Amino acid sequence: MWDIDFNRLRDVFVYDPQAPMIFSSGIFLWLFAAFILVYLLLQHRLTARLLFVTAFSYYFYYKSSGTYFFLLALVTVSDFFIARFMAGTSVGWKRKASVVLSLAINLGLLAYFKYTNFLGDVFASLLGGTFHHYDIFLPVGISFFTFQSLSYTIDVYRKDITPLTNLLDYAFYVSFFPQLGAGPIVRARDFIPQIRRPLFVSHEMFGRGIFLIASGLFKKAIISDYISVNFVERIFDNPTLYSGVENLMGVYGYALQIYCDFSGYSDMAIGIALLLGFHFNKNFDSPYKSASITEFWRRWHISLSSWLKDYLYISLGGNRKGKIRQYANLVITMFLGGLWHGASWNFVVWGLFHGIALAAHKFWMTLTGRKKGEESHGIRRFFGILITFHFVCFCWIFFRNADFSTSLDMIKQICTTFRPQLFPQLIAGYWEVFVLMALGFFLHFCPDRWENACCKTVTRLPLMGKAVLMLALIYLVIQMKSTEIQPFIYFQF
């Protein structure tokens, strides 16, 4: 007789808000192994394969956000038919009204689920009243799939792409599970041509996919989660209980945590896509190696920064209407980019700081006569990296803290109670955390050729060697995991 644990079986199919499905969870890793087997069986049956992947993607989203998967379906169906309507008319006002409707649907959903309570507080404060918060659930990844779908309708409006005629293809594009929860934001012009190509995964694609999944899992589940639970959260939850040097180390820890968390997710998403025969563009390119804030935004969350540039900054006028307008457009773009991350004044401040810094750097480039893209070298680059990294860390204080006053408390502690003599004691008390932090920053700052060499080594491993590598990593993750699942940070956006 089979001894079936029906409770465990139920957990596979029923949404649990306390245990959302994420790439680093055990249930996903086992389900993905089964998914790959079915995917390979359907390799010569295109329509069945697209249906299977789309259904799995909706299941994946249901396990992350429950019944709110209907929002994903709503955005998909509405934008598909809006784009079809735009393609069928050459009347200017009809096309413009259609893209405005797409904007209203996507941004309206985003505004309700993400900004209702924030805007209520703002208006109540302005009018001298009070606002009682609504209990509104924030669906995972809503900022990502609305922006991704919006880029499609805007591109159709601009006549940059030809709209799809098959709803299944569009549903596949919007819901493709590797990037559904937290990006990268994949452009239609890059992804859609890949949908109906014959399934092909080269030896190099397979090897790089395994390497990216392994490195992403290592960054997320071993480095990011461990330093978060065992150090960073304690500092940020009560900064006034800790000295300035402890707060500063906490900020450095968060800078590494958010990078390893988000780039780890992106690496896993890109790696999983490669195993399925799809190519995504790189989303992170060693951002803390940047010698200027402009370079940082060319390396950090590349899919979002390029989206903001192409669909917001350029739409505002970009650099075409004079320097003053360019600087204002940069600040406005980053202000809205801050709001995209969350409904809080902390995110507004974070975005404004980055916008002002970008404008200041553009002004400095003009003042010194340096050309766009011109890189510094030697000692100038070293100090550029040092200054940029610490500016970004300063901004992370506002990004991470729950409110503005806590951010100011942390800055005050760093400036007034530094106490460097406590550093040896701090290292002794948290030596495991600092070993992982040192390892994380070392891996980040090591030359790109080292990463490429590691990738080639994994690619050359036989299939059994790759399996042993993944099993060993999974075992290590299980040994080091905290008692609770640590969702990816960008799931909340």
Q: Where are the language model's segments positioned?
A:
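Membrane-embedded transmembrane alpha-helical bundles that form the catalytic cores
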Residues: W2-Q492
